[in-house]
């Protein structure tokens, strides 16, 4: 399946509490990919400069528009690395609000419905502390050798994540569907 951009999926598949995410970067990877909007093919943005690697599968929620003018980004906690460009049905458990080079950059934290290792968690407060600390550490340092500043602002619960997803879906609809 070719996903040319965040528009190429039925709106019925994107709800605040049950959505399909597009994975761009597999858990454990140091390669930062982004979906090329012109071709729909993943392109290498960069190899991370630090020795860190993505602590979770990373991608975006199609048919959303966030404050940074990109789709809403999502960390998918899963027991296995998921191949880039895979669709994965998820539900949100929380979010990380952070600053990236002086700009707000929210990251939704989600769980796949079909991963028995993680699908018993329903709020960020339930995940093992070490999993949370790995995510926080990663986003605090992953751009440090590029001389770019990142800082975790706060961790918010499931209700806050659902609200941010609702707003990003509504903004998308206002921009592209009216």
Question: What is each PLM-predicted segment?
Answer:
Residues 43, 62-64, 85, 94, ...:
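Solvent-exposed, non-transmembrane amphipathic alpha-helical segments
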Residues 71-126:
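Short, structured beta-strand-loop surface elements
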Residues 115-178:
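C-terminal, well-folded lobe of enzymatic/effector domains
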Residues 63-66, 77-79, 137-144:
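Short, intrinsically disordered, mixed-charge
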Residues 7-13:
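Extended, highly charged
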Residues 1-5:
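Conserved small/polar residues in nucleotide/adenosyl-binding loops
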Residues 49-52, 63, 87-88, 102-105, ...:
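Short, surface-exposed, polar/charged, turn-prone segments marking secondary-structure boundaries
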Residues 15-59, 63-72, 77, 84-87:
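Betabetaalpha-Me/HNH-type nuclease active-site subdomain
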């Amino acid at each position: 399946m070719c996903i040319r951009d965040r528009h190429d999926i039925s709106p019925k598949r994107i709800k605040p509490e049950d959505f399909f995410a597009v994975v761009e970067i597999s858990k454990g990877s140091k390669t930062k990919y982004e979906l090329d909007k012109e071709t729909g093919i993943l392109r290498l943005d960069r190899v991370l400069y630090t020795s860190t690697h993505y602590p979770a599968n990373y991608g975006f929620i199609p048919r959303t528009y966030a404050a940074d003018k990109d789709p809403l980004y999502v960390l998918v906690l899963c027991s296995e690395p998921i191949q880039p460009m895979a669709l994965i049905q998820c539900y949100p458990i929380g979010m990380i609000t952070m600053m990236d080079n002086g700009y707000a950059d929210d990251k939704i934290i989600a769980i796949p419905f079909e991963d028995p290792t993680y699908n018993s968690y329903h709020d960020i407060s339930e995940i093992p502390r070490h999993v949370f600390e790995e995510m926080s550490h990663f986003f605090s340092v992953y751009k440090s050798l590029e001389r770019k500043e990142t800082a975790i602002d706060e961790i918010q619960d499931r209700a806050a994540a659902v609200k941010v997803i609702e707003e990003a879906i509504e903004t998308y609809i206002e921009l592209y569907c009216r």
